[in-house]
């Protein structure tokens, strides 16, 4: 992944990529390439005014590459060249996508690519109903860019410096953006599982939710809970905030609260200035950013299923139960171990990044935590700190974004390798005290 990151940075550092024709400083080109391929959305320079159309095309390609995953895009290229996918890549994709066998890998990837293009295309067409009247022909490019960025949970746009704050009350922009974010964040496994169930519903008249896999049940349930609880919390704590929602009507508060609850789940778009949020809302946003979206999707974060498994395991331990159960099914020990590893990794990365960033900047602690968690969970929301970072601050965030995106994937591969190569000889067990 770092090779594509470097290639992208070199392309963005070319004068042709700059709107002024003068080369952008390499550190900003590297930062932009990293935030694009990691689908984060934090930017040190305004995307809409700094980059030329060519530069924006490079950014969009990196976003699509990062959102879909390198192997998925590679398959698309190989399919176009009529080449076959290697057995090693098939095994890795089986683990990453959590499929039962490798026989359906090619078919699944084809569905992912086609489904992604269809959803992004529909989103772009809906955006055009708003952006073309407002921006003319340029609105077509803006619509395409926003659709890909929203679906890939990147949160980058080419309209203005204040993201979507000018569209806080625009129903179409709000609905399309939230829908694309949610669809991308739910993950491809949930997509096809829901479609499979809907087909069975038509033919067998069975209850929909009961037919879903455990993975889909957890992802959909946790996603719904986080959106409702998050939106309610933002509505309450921003109700009397003169800098955000105090002067809004009730419907406008609902729109703004819903969008904030959705976008903090690793999207990065904003309809209200993040630096104007109350400290309580900022802390809630940090928690939502850490949780993120669902596995095998375009979102980042620790993932909804990971948090659910960890909580269920915790309550099972407290209740002195041998197995963690959810929706009438036992959670595999391997899933519990993986969840602990992912959560631990995220907290370590975010903590170290926060400490290091606090050394090189004198910003408020809440702003630093917001920035580092946003980078770790590849969200892209900032309390106006990113553009003020010095060289060391930019390097810290670049590394944080990279680790936050690559780390979970590396853990999945590590656990899958461990599963296939179990040690026959084990060391003796000895009890220790914890807690």
Predicted regions and their residues:
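Membrane-proximal intracellular helices of multi-pass ion channels
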Residues: 3-435
């Amino acid at each position: 992944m770092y090779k594509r990151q470097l290639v992208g940075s070199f392309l963005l550092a070319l004068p042709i990529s700059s709107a002024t024709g003068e080369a952008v400083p390499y550190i900003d080109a590297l930062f932009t390439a990293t935030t694009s391929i990691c689908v984060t959305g934090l930017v040190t320079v305004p995307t809409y005014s700094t980059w030329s159309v060519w530069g924006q095309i490079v950014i969009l390609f990196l976003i699509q590459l990062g959102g879909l995953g390198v192997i998925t895009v590679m398959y698309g290229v190989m399919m176009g060249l009529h080449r076959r996918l290697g057995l090693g890549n098939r095994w890795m994709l089986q683990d990453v996508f959590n499929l039962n066998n490798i026989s359906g890998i090619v078919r699944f990837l084809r569905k992912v690519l086609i489904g992604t293009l269809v959803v992004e295309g529909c989103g772009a067409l809906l955006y055009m109903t708003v952006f073309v009247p407002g921006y003319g022909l340029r609105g077509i490019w803006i619509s395409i860019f926003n659709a890909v960025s929203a679906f890939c949970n990147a949160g980058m746009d080419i309209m203005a410096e204040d993201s979507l704050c000018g569209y806080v009350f625009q129903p179409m922009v709000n609905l399309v953006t939230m829908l694309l974010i949610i669809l991308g964040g739910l993950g491809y496994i949930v997509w096809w599982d829901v479609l499979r169930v809907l087909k069975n519903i038509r033919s067998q008249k069975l209850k929909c939710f009961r037919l879903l896999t455990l993975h889909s049940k957890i992802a959909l349930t946790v996603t719904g809970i986080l959106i409702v609880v998050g939106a309610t919390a933002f509505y309450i704590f921003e109700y009397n905030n003169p800098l955000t929602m105090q002067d809004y009507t009730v419907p406008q508060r609902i729109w703004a609260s819903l969008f904030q609850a959705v976008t903090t789940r690793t999207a990065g778009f904003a309809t209200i200035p993040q630096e104007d949020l109350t400290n309580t809302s900022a802390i809630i946003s940090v928690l939502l950013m850490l949780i993120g979206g669902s596995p095998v999707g375009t979102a980042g974060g620790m993932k909804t299923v990971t948090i659910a498994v960890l909580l269920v395991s915790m309550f099972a331990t407290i209740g002195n139960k041998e197995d963690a159960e959810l929706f009438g099914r036992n959670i595999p020990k391997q899933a519990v171990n993986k969840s602990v590893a992912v959560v631990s990794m995220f907290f370590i990365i975010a903590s170290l990044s926060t400490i290091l960033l606090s050394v090189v900047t004198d910003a408020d602690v809440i702003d630093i935590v917001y920035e580092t968690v946003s980078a770790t969970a590849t969200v892209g929301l900032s309390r106006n700190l990113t553009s003020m970072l010095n060289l060391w601050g930019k390097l810290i965030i670049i590394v944080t974004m990279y680790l936050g995106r690559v780390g979970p994937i590396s853990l999945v591969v590590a656990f899958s390798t461990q599963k296939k190569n179990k040690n026959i000889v084990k060391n003796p067990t000895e009890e220790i005290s914890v807690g």
